[in-house]
Amino acid sequence: MIIGVGTDLVEIARIAQSIERLGERFIDRILTAAEKERWSEISNLEKANSFVAKRFAAKEAAVKALGTGIGLGVSFQHFNVSNLPSGQPVLTVDESIIARYDFPVSWHLSLTDEKAYAQAFVILESK
């Protein structure tokens, strides 16, 4: 059964401006340690900005599916986005968020980017 659905669309240039203006403070707020490690390995600036924008969108979509938004005990750090060898994105959610449910849940994530925008779609469902 679907518990929640979330989507987010972000302008990549807006994320790039935040990175330029706030630097590591912004990166540390948005990316987990594992994501930050992957981001630091990207040498192309456009790809690096897209990487951050997609993760930002994914986490915003996740909190919309959760129904909480960022704040009130939920932060960007509670969500990690990685990829399977096939390229499929995977959303890993902190146990403190999962513990809110008395039943097992699954998170499904779809990401896309096209020129100026990054978009994420998240479905939260009971198993």
Swiss-Prot record:
What's the cofactor?
Answer: Mg(2+)
Q: Which organism is it from?
A: Marinomonas sp. (strain MWYL1)
Is the keyword Lipid metabolism in the record?
yes
- Enzyme Commission no: 2.7.8.7
The domain of life for this entry's organism is: Bacteria
**The gene coding this protein:** acpS
Chain positions recorded as Mg(2+) binding sites: D8, E60
Gene Ontology biological process terms in this record = fatty acid biosynthetic process
Question: What GO cellular component term, any one, is given?
Answer: cytoplasm
The reply to whether Transmembrane figures as a keyword in the UniProt entry is no
Q: What class of enzyme is it?
A: transferase
Q: A Pfam family this protein belongs to?
A: ACPS
Q: What name has this protein been given in UniProt?
A: Holo-[acyl-carrier-protein] synthase
Where located? Cytoplasm
Q: Record's family?
A: Belongs to the P-Pant transferase superfamily. AcpS family.
